[in-house]
Structures are given as structure tokens and as C-alpha cells.
Regions:
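Short glycine-rich substrate-engagement loop in P-loop NTPases that contacts/grips substrate
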Residues: 57-90
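Hydrophobic positions on the alpha1 helix immediately C-terminal to the Walker A/P-loop
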Residues: 38, 42
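Conserved lysine of the Walker
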Residues: 35
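Interdomain motor-coupling "hinge/lid" segment immediately C-terminal to the ATP-binding subdomain
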Residues: 124, 130-264
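Active-site beta-strand-loop-beta-strand hairpin of nuclease catalytic cores
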Residues: 384-392
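Hydrophobic anchor at the beta1->P-loop junction of P-loop NTPases
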Residues: 27
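N-terminal pre-Walker A segment at the start of P-loop NTPase domains
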Residues: 1-18
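Accessory nucleic acid-recognition modules appended to NTPase machines
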Residues: 214-380, 387
Length: 448
């Protein structure tokens, strides 16, 4: 199945190409998020000739970049290996897929940039992940070097909720209408409200992995969706076994497999003793970092106070861990979860699904994630910068205000907060400085 959906990365690729001083591009992101498809599709639209090298599929391509890295030598070796390849200055784009598997190719980006005759676009997953390389690859990497100042890196994520809406036929006029409802604080039309809720419930099950999205849209069969998601999870686990340092391999997998249990708790702070009863941070911190660097999870940090700057006020040792893609989390839960979600129940598992959905939406916007928790009962699911203020965000099923929101809004002199947002199963409204929004409008809460 090779369906191309509209992706936001396209505008970033276009801006890169139109910049007269652009450098070779590296599109970085978790495996299976659509990097290769987006880059190849873009190149086909803009270049007459494409030279595509996949270093994961064809490790023998590495020899094209030894013993030296000048562009003419690389082209000579390449055309000897692939005689029918057409390479013309000004009309050719080189695509280096899975460039992390060939450090010398990444070093060559400097020489392609200085040469200036050809465009280069790369994709990379597991870039910079500790222990990724074998001993042989490490020797290659030591001989190579990252071309600092000679490459541009763009992050790419799985499809976000807005891209999901596009894939399901939602038009710009419909999204503009939602923006208008947010700006004017007016309820969404009942028919559209029902449609967006339905699409949200489906998104929670499917998530944003392009292959999974394609299978759902083509077949509507949840069984096939689940099988594909679990295959992707298995591929992630295989990467953990294949590429991590030997001592880290079991710990990385244990950390990863503990995520549903971590999120099933009332207070969802990541606790190493849930990974293993004798687990300690010093034993598992590097393993968790590996999963985060691979783009599979996102951390959400507790903050000392509800005040900007959030990063400066964050507590680096206290954090929750969410799956970067909500569909993959749901695929890790017990059978029957998908059916419950389609019926509108997003609040099971002690709010884990709902919270991870918000983390998915905010994270794919490029937001760093923060929350606020103090002993004594004050907990805000998320805090974020919005319209220049620190804004608490509550994710709850009920319509009443929680004790935490009432306390924080009732003591602005202590918490330095005057407005809050509540996301849930209701329409747009405002009361006592609390903006209530349907969950499907969370993607409109950009930092600007």
C-alpha cells in the first residue's frame, strides 16, 4: 500500500529548497514516520534525476564513500557500480536514506555542499542513539565526522491530528471554522462537533504512523490496524536488541514495556521500581534515554512553579513518560480497548489514554511537555506557554472544575496563573477564566 498523504514536512522541504544558501538536508525522525516517502515524493516533483541510496537495505553502498570523499570520486565509484545512473549538475538530487548506517556518507555532506553542483537530501532514524553502532561501525564513525555547519536538520514526526484530518477529507475551511470558534469562544456546530469527535476517537486507535493510517482508511478493519501497529512495535524492540550496548539491551526493553503500567497509576510519574522491583535510576536512566533519543517516547517534566520559563523551572528528575504516538500506546493495551474507545470512552486506564492523547498532539506540534504536581493534592495534567502566559491544561471527563484548577485560579498571587484550559468531551465555552474546549481542538493551541 503506497498512498501519499499531505504532510506538513512538505512546506519545510519547499522552504529549504527555496533558500539560496541552503545546505544538504537531514530529515530526522522515528522509524516508520514517513521520512523516506516524503523526501522521495518531494524530489520527484523538483528534480529530473534522482540518485537513491538506502544504506540499511544495501550496506554495500558504504564502499562508495571510501577511500576519499570528494564528489567526483564518489560519482565515479557510483556510476561504476550502477552504470545506468544519470547524474547532471543542477538537475540531480542525491537521497541518502538511513544515513546513520553510513557515517562516511554523512561526512561527505560537507564536500557536496562545497562542490555545489548537486542537491542532497537525507533521512535518519536512531541518529545519535547511544550504542547504536557495532564495533566495526564505531571504527567507521571514529574515522568519519559529523559535518558541523554543512548540514541542516529538520525533525519529522508521525502524522499529527491535523494531518489525520486532512487524510480523512477535512478541508481547510472546516479547520478555519474551528479556529474561528476558538477565537470567538463560540460553540462548534452540532453536526461538525459530532464528526470531529468521531474522527478523534478513530485517531486515538489508529495514531499517526502513515502505513497504519493508510490501512485504516482503505479497509476500516481494526484487526489489520492492530496487527500493523504491533509489527512496528516489534521492529522497535528488534532495534533495541540489535543496536543497543549489550548491557543495556534488557534494560531498554524493560523500560519500554513498563510504559502502560507506569501510565495506569493515579500519579503517573515514571518510577524505576515499576520497571523492576529493584530498579534504580542509575541503572535505567541511560536505557530510558535510548528510547527517547529513538523518538519512541516523550518525557513530560514536573515544574517547581507555574511560571515561565517552563524549561528553567522544570525538575529534571521528576517526569512522566508518554508514547510519542497514541495509536502505538493503545496497541500495547489489552484486547477490547479499541472497541471501548470507538464507543467514546477515552477516560479508562485512570486517564492514561486521554493524557497520552494530549501528549501526542502537543508533542507533534513540537512542544516540550510539562506538568505541575505538589504533595498535598495539587496536580495539573499539563502546563504550557500559550499567548505569552503560563496556562494550566486539565484533561478530565467531568464538567466540573477539579480541586487543583479551582485552587490555582483562586490564588493568582501564589501560583501566578490567571487563566486555564480544560480539554474534554464538551463544546467550546468560558466560565471564571476557564476556557473549556473539545479535545479535538487541542491541536489549535500553538505557542504563538
Amino acid at each position: 500500500m503506497n498512498i501519499m498523504y499531505q504532510r506538513k514536512i512538505e512546506s519545510k522541504l519547499q522552504a529549504w529548497l527555496e533558500d539560496p544558501s541552503h545546505k544538504p538536508l537531514v530529515v530526522k525522525g522515528v522509524r516508520q514516520c514517513g521520512k523516506t516517502s516524503s523526501v522521495v515524493d518531494f524530489a520527484k516533483k523538483h528534480f529530473k534525476h534522482i540518485v537513491y541510496l538506502d544504506f540499511r537495505e544495501h550496506p554495500d553502498y558504504k564502499k562508495l564513500f571510501t577511500p576519499n570523499l570528494d564528489v567526483d570520486s564518489i560519482i565515479m565509484r557510483l556510476t561504476a557500480l550502477m552504470p545506468n545512473t544519470e547524474i547532471k549538475p543542477g538537475k540531480t538530487c542525491f537521497i541518502f536514506d538511513e544515513i546513520q548506517d553510513c557515517p562516511q556518507a554523512r561526512s561527505a555532506l560537507k564536500y557536496f555542499h562545497l562542490d555545489g553542483r548537486y542537491e542532497v537530501m537525507c533521512t535518519g532514524s536512531l541518529l545519535g542513539v547511544n550504542g547504536y553502532k557495532s564495533k566495526e561501525d564505531k571504527r567507521e564513525e571514529e574515522e568519519a565526522s559529523i559535518p558541523v555547519g554543512f548540514e541542516e536538520i529538520v525533525d519529522m514526526y508521525p502524522m499529527d491530528f491535523e494531518e489525520w484530518l486532512w487524510a480523512n477529507g477535512i478541508k481547510p475551511m472546516h479547520i478555519d471554522y474551528l479556529k474561528k470558534c476558538l477565537t470567538e469562544i463560540t460553540p462548534v456546530d452540532d453536526a461538525l462537533h459530532s464528526r470531529f469527535k468521531e474522527l478523534l476517537h478513530q485517531y486515538v486507535i489508529v495514531g499517526g504512523m502513515p502505513e497504519v493510517v493508510g490501512i485504516f482508511i482503505e479497509t476500516r478493519q481494526i484487526g489489520k490496524v492492530l496487527a500493523t501497529q504491533r509489527r512496528i512495535i516489534d521492529e522497535y524492540k528488534a532495534d533495541m536488541i540489535k543496536y543497543a550496548l549489550p548491557a543495556d539491551k534488557p534494560r531498554i526493553r524493560e523500560c519500554f514495556e513498563s510504559i502502560p503500567s507506569q501510565l495506569a497509576r493515579e500519579y503517573k510519574k515514571f518510577v524505576y521500581s515499576i520497571v523492576r522491583s529493584t530498579g534504580r535510576g542509575r541503572d535505567y536512566a541511560g536505557s530510558l534515554q535510548w528510547i527517547e533519543d529513538a523518538g519512541i517516547i516523550r518525557r513530560c517534566y514536573n515544574t517547581e512553579i507555574t511560571e515561565l520559563p517552563l524549561d528553567g523551572n522544570s525538575i529534571q528528575t521528576e517526569f512522566k513518560v508518554y508514547m510519542a504516538d497514541i495509536g502505538l500506546l493503545v496497541s500495547m493495551l489489552e484486547e477490547g480497548t479499541q472497541s471501548s474507545i470507538l464507543e467514546g470512552n477515552l477516560f479508562s486506564h485512570k486517564g492514561a489514554i486521554f493524557e497520552n492523547l494530549v501528549a501526542d498532539i502537543f508533542g507533534k506540534m513540537g512542544r516540550k511537555l510539562y506538568y505541575f504536581h505538589k504533595n498535598g493534592g495539587i496536580e495539573l495534567d499539563f502546563v504550557m506557554r500559550y499567548k505569552g502566559q503560563c496556562i494550566p491544561v486539565e484533561c478530565k471527563a467531568n464538567t466540573g472544575n477539579s480541586k487543583s484548577i479551582r485552587t490555582v485560579l483562586g490564588h493568582p498571587e501564589k501560583y501566578r496563573v490567571t487563566n486555564a484550559i480544560k480539554l474534554g468531551d464538551y463544546n467550546v465555552g468560558m466560565k471564571d477564566n476557564l476556557l473549556t474546549l473539545p479535545m479535538y481542538m487541542a491541536f489549535l493551541l500553538s505557542e504563538v
